[in-house]
From Swiss-Prot:
Signal peptide, first to last residue: none
UniProt entry tagged with the keyword Cell cycle: yes
Subunit description: Interacts with FtsZ via their C-terminal domains.
Protein name: Cell division protein ZipA
Family statement drawn from the similarity comment of this UniProt entry: Belongs to the ZipA family.
Gene this protein is translated from: zipA
Length: 380
């Protein structure tokens, strides 16, 4: 429905636009050109001006005076001569032909009319030449030379000057003048004396440098260096990081179950009757961390492990360490967590608190600080 209504509106608007366009064209043709300014039919009356006796109006402007020129007189004379010629010959001219056209066509008609005689043409030419000469003597081209000058203005009578004969002079050659020199020998201008420039030699400076080098006392310098106090290298105190795996109350770790777990973790029974973890998994190399009995005296009886029982074990590592301290700490922490999982125990820190993520970060920062101090000590 909306589409049909839209189409109807479009058709109606197109019809209205075309009707307006056709009406505009029709009105333009009817009026021919409405944009042209219409000239008024009534002519404007010229303004009349009153002139006084001297010929000036109220604005002080005089009347226009037209002076006939010599050219107009010349044209009139030529026109009259041409018309008389055509009348004598019996040639009729049209009324609308102007005299100027007669003058322009004079030569053409003279050639066409073969009846005219040469004598009459010569008379016409002579008359036209005389008229031209007379026109040249007009007031505009004349100069009044009739006035004569008096003797007072001209002065005494002029006597003709005697003719001067031109005398041709012979060209004279200039004589060479010989001037004797005042001095027997030519004088040469003395050159200005140059100021002596003292050149500074570079050899003395080199000598002084060498002399200074020779005079250096190396024995004194060696004695000064020996007298300077030697810096004592600061030795860092070793630190120990301890982790403990403790059983709950009224529970113990049995030696028969503990021994295979320790061997699985790569620990080997060794010095001080405790278990150690070496750099190599086969038990070779330096010790990285160790495991001891939490109960006094802290050792294990390997021959009597089946009858052995304890409340827990302690894992510890020393700083500086034979291996990477960060990786060694990760191995020791993983071993403690694995033992705690097998025996349902808890992992405690060196203050016998439960191990948390914050405690782990504290241990790592402690290892990082010790590593920084050790590097500084090595540089010094």
């Amino acid at each position: 429905m909306e589409d049909n209504f839209r189409n109807v509106l479009i058709i109606l608007s197109a019809i209205v636009i075309t009707a307006i366009f056709i009406h505009g064209l029709w009105t333009l043709r009817k009026q021919k050109n409405p944009y042209k300014l219409k000239t008024s039919k009534d002519k404007a009356d010229p303004i009349t001006r009153d002139f006084d006796r001297k010929g000036f109006d109220q604005d002080g402007v005089g009347q226009v005076k037209v002076k006939p020129s010599a050219e107009n007189d010349k044209i009139n004379l030529e026109n009259e001569a041409v018309t008389e010629h055509f009348i004598t010959e019996g040639i009729q001219l049209p009324d609308d032909l102007s005299k100027s056209q007669i003058i322009i066509k004079n030569d053409v008609l003279g050639d066409l009319a073969g009846q005219t005689s040469k004598a009459k043409q010569e008379e016409l030419d002579n008359n036209s030449i005389q008229e031209l000469d007379s026109s040249l003597e007009d007031d505009w081209f004349k100069e009044d030379n009739s006035g004569q000058f008096s003797k007072g203005e001209l002065g005494d009578e002029l006597t003709p000057a005697p003719a001067v004969e031109k005398v041709k002079k012979k060209p004279t050659k200039p004589k060479a003048v010989h001037i004797e020199p005042l001095y027997e020998q030519p004088v040469t201008q003395a050159k200005p004396a140059r100021t002596p420039i003292n050149k500074v030699s570079k050899t003395p400076s080199k000598a002084t440098l060498k002399r200074d080098q020779i005079e250096i006392d190396f024995d004194n310098q060696m004695s000064e260096q020996a007298a300077a106090p030697k810096k004592i290298k600061t030795q860092l105190e070793p630190q120990v990081i301890i982790l403990s795996v403790v059983m709950p109350a009224n529970q113990q770790m049995l030696g028969a179950a503990l021994l295979p777990s320790l061997l699985t973790l790569g620990l080997k029974y060794g010095e001080m009757n405790i278990f150690h973890r070496h750099e190599d998994n086969a038990g070779k190399g330096k010790v990285t961390f160790s495991l001891a009995n939490i109960m006094n005296p802290g050792s294990f009886d390997l021959d009597n492990m089946e009858n052995f029982a304890t409340r827990g074990v302690s894992l510890f590592m020393t700083l500086p360490n034979a291996g990477d301290p960060f990786s060694v700490f990760e191995q020791m922490l993983n071993a403690a967590k694995q033992l705690a999982q097998e025996f349902n125990a808890q992992v405690l820190d060196d203050k016998r608190n439960v191990m948390t993520k914050q405690t782990e970060q504290h241990y790592l920062s402690k290892i990082r600080e010790f590593d920084r101090k050790s590097r500084i000590a090595l540089v010094e």
